[in-house]
UniProtKB/Swiss-Prot annotation:
Transmembrane segments: none annotated. This is Pyridoxine 5'-phosphate synthase. HAMAP family: PdxJ (MF_00279). It comes from Ectopseudomonas mendocina (strain ymp) (Pseudomonas mendocina). Signal peptide: none annotated. GO terms for biological process: pyridoxine biosynthetic process.
Amino acid sequence: MTEANRILLGVNIDHVATLRQARGTRYPDPVKAALDAEEAGADGITVHLREDRRHIQDRDVRVLADVLQTRMNFEMGVTDFMLGFAEQIRPAHVCLVPETRQELTTEGGLDVAGQEARIAAAVERLTLAGCEVSLFIDAEERQIEAAMRVGAPAIELHTGRYADAHTAEEAAQELSRIRDGVICGLNHGLIVNAGHGLHYHNAEAVAAIPGINELNIGHAIVAHALFVGFKQAVAEMKALIVAAAYRG
């Protein structure tokens, strides 16, 4: 496999913590899940420290920062607290995401175009802390161009609408939007990642898009792990997207 069609897998372990928080126990441990994921071939570990702390906790992030052998992709809202926290932890990668307390999960991309000054200031702070910053955005030209203007070196395209498509035609349309977004991002010199709602039956089509650097996948892996074990679930997803990227 050449660098041109190499693809990375970021494993999101948020929902291991969701299961733990459901009963307020100390198990299952998302840190152990992260280490198992690395052993199974994950190229990075993604965690989202939400304002309401519904799954990942501050301590999880601190421990992960010390023990990960790959790299952390730290998802966070654009708040003063989170910026300060990231400056302390200094994760390798930070992905800025939109966040509201009422949402079940992240519902859409960050509106970079509508708040360029605020996002640019956050990108600058995080970059000075040694973090590579990506912006979680919809596959829209105006948002991609805004991401470039604010100084982010990378974007993560929101694949939720593709994942939630009700018909094959709708899925094809959304996949086309993602493909166009990848091309646009690459043309603007950005690293292009993608994620949200991807699983074992829909990730291949996204992985096959030329130029995709990394897919971030979590819920599907955690769910599949209930039946096959965490390492096996990660290994299967890694093999699936690598094969798709090679064919694509």
